[in-house]
């Protein structure tokens, strides 16, 4: 990806804003997706992508092209590209759910639930099924780092089939760890002492 490809090119962000193309930002994201994995190359993912930048290309389109590029590199000799592709898909998911500053931290699960309930995507009553102290305990069990353990095939299934989303627009509203924990919280909502007996931790322990 040569710097000359940025000349005058504008990209459209997920929030509708338009800004100059930043190839360095793309490269850093691919590097992060490859971090700690043997037998993979960020440069190879970028070259394989063959992205043709044009004015108005969306960041979502760029992300999906990079995901496909990494997934196309998966073979018997380079199996770790399945994790590169998964991470690139995950980064796009995080941006969609939390915005561009997702890497600064994830919202408390109770905050995420209440916001989702206001938007009509979660049951309004679930937040009241547990005390604030119980929600704090539930939040402490969530380890978003587990998302990094997904293979591409596994995460693709979760994203396409199970996460809460608008099927008409494709907009996603939650991440895998929130999904697992909120499903568990719903199942055990009427069980006495469900939190103290740690029933709710089971789905996240077995999340991959």
Across the structure, where does each feature detected by a protein language model lie?
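Extended catalytic cores of very large enzyme megasubunits
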Residues: 1-200
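Single conserved hydrophobic/aromatic residue that forms the stacking wall/gate
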Residues: 199-208
């Amino acid at each position: 990806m040569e710097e000359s490809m940025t000349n005058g090119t504008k990209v459209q962000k997920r929030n509708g804003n338009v800004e100059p193309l930043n190839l360095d930002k793309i490269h850093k994201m691919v590097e992060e997706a490859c971090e700690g994995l043997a037998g993979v190359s960020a440069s190879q993912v970028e070259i394989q992508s063959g992205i043709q930048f044009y004015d108005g290309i969306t960041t979502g389109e760029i992300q999906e092209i990079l995901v496909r590029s990494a997934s196309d590199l998966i073979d018997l000799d380079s199996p770790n590209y399945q994790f590169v592709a998964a991470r690139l898909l995950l980064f796009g998911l995080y941006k969609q759910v939390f915005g561009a500053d997702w890497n600064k931290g994830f919202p408390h699960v109770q905050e995420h639930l209440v916001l989702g309930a206001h938007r009509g995507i979660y049951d309004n009553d679930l937040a009241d099924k547990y005390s604030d102290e119980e929600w704090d305990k539930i939040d402490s069990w969530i380890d978003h780092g587990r998302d990094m353990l997904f293979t591409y095939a596994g995460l693709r299934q979760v994203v396409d089939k199970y996460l809460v989303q608008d099927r008409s627009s494709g907009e996603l509203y939650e991440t895998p760890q929130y999904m697992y924990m909120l499903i568990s919280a719903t199942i055990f909502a009427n069980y006495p002492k469900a939190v103290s007996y740690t029933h709710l931790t089971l789905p996240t322990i077995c999340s991959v």
